[in-house]
Regions:
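A short C-terminal boundary segment appended to hydrolase-like catalytic domains
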Residues: 257-290
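Cys-nucleophile CN-hydrolase/nitrilase-fold catalytic domain and related Cys-dependent amidase chemistry
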Residues: 17-113, 183-197, 202
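Extreme N-terminal starter segment of soluble prokaryotic enzymes
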Residues: 1-6
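A short, polar/charged loop-to-alpha-helix boundary motif
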Residues: 122-135, 254-269
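Short beta-strand scaffold segments in enzyme catalytic cores
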Residues: 92-93, 106-110, 142, 208, ...
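CN hydrolase (nitrilase-like) catalytic-core segments centered on the catalytic cysteine
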Residues: 71, 75-91, 160-254
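Short polar catalytic/cofactor-binding loops
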Residues: 8-15
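Active-site catalytic loop in hydrolytic enzyme cores
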Residues: 97-171, 184-197, 276, 282
């Protein structure tokens, strides 16, 4: 049994590095004290670093991501130090990163007790990212080997595309981390429904962490709504609706952790002994439509 913590992350203004570092450390300490071994924050949680920029720069959609680039390495070092100190796995949400080709990508690093395990870029861009923000798509999917099991990361919109999760499942992932950032109930439910569908199709677990709250100082994070949740395939020994845990409200005033547990061996058992074999039978559908 693994104890996980997914954050409903309230977007707050932290105008100095010290204030931000204290905030992140204190927030993570709450989950660690609750016994969590893996902590998940949402998509674009790293963009909160833009609070340290001038009001003019943080209020400009493109200037804000330019301005945070010098803060990314200190931010990574902070996240790594927290993971090492507490012996945990930390996925601190995603952050826009200037890549080697001069394009910005939405990147999610994973940190563990021994340091940086790697990163996953978002692959499918929303209309906002494509049309207004010029965030570029990443390439390729990573499966991370950890002491807890094999993990994959699908950032927000990526959860709405079945073949991405399928590739992670084929690579051995038992748990997908789904950091998300949505500004409407419809947006939140698109990601959640996608996450639950991916859990059903691949007979794996999916953990979702959303942004919440209002941040009028940030044009990218101004409105946020969503619930944290842990989803599994509905089957023998699993919840009938596939929902292991779900936040009570979608717009809390402050950041809240959803601390929950999953037995990945029980999830694997469903793949062997379940009422249905959606994972095994996946290829058969393509034989039926030719």
């Amino acid at each position: 049994m693994i104890r996980l913590a997914a954050c409903q992350y309230a977007i707050e203004l932290h105008e100095t590095w010290e204030a931000y570092a204290d905030h992140l450390q204190g927030l993570c300490a709450e989950a660690v004290e609750a016994g969590a071994r893996l902590l998940l924050l949402p998509e674009y949680a790293g963009l909160v670093l833009s609070g340290q920029l001038s009001a003019e720069q943080r209020g400009d959609l493109k200037a804000s991501i330019v301005g945070i680039q010098p803060l990314i390495e200190p931010w990574k070092a902070l996240c790594e130090s927290l993971a090492r100190r507490w012996g945990i796995y930390l996925q601190p949400g995603s952050i826009p990163v200037l890549d080697r080709d001069g394009r910005y990508r939405n990147r999610a690093w994973l940190f563990g007790p021994k340091g940086v395990l790697g990163y996953q870029d978002k692959l499918m861009m929303t209309r906002f990212e494509r049309e207004q923000w010029d965030i570029a798509a990443g390439q390729g999917l990573q499966v991370f080997d950890t002491e807890l099991g094999r993990l994959g990361i699908l950032i927000c919109y990526d959860n709405e595309f079945p073949m991405l999760a399928r590739r992670l499942a084929e690579g051995g992932a038992d748990l997908i981390l789904a950091p998300s950032c949505t500004d409407t109930e419809a947006g939140y439910h698109r990601v959640r429904i996608g996450a639950q569908a991916r859990a059903l199709e691949n007979q794996i677990a999916v953990l979702q962490s959303p942004t919440v709250g209002l941040a009028p100082w940030s044009p990218a994070l101004d409105e946020n709504i969503g619930r944290a949740g842990l989803f599994v395939p509905p089957d023998h020994g699993m919840p009938g609706d596939g929902v292991v845990a779900l936040s009570e409200e979608s717009s809390p005033a402050t950041s809240q952790w959803l601390v929950c547990e999953v037995d990945l061996e029980e999830v694997r058992r469903v793949r062997r002994e379940g009422q249905v074999f959606t994972r095994r039978d996946w290829p058969e559908q393509f034989e039926r439509i030719v």
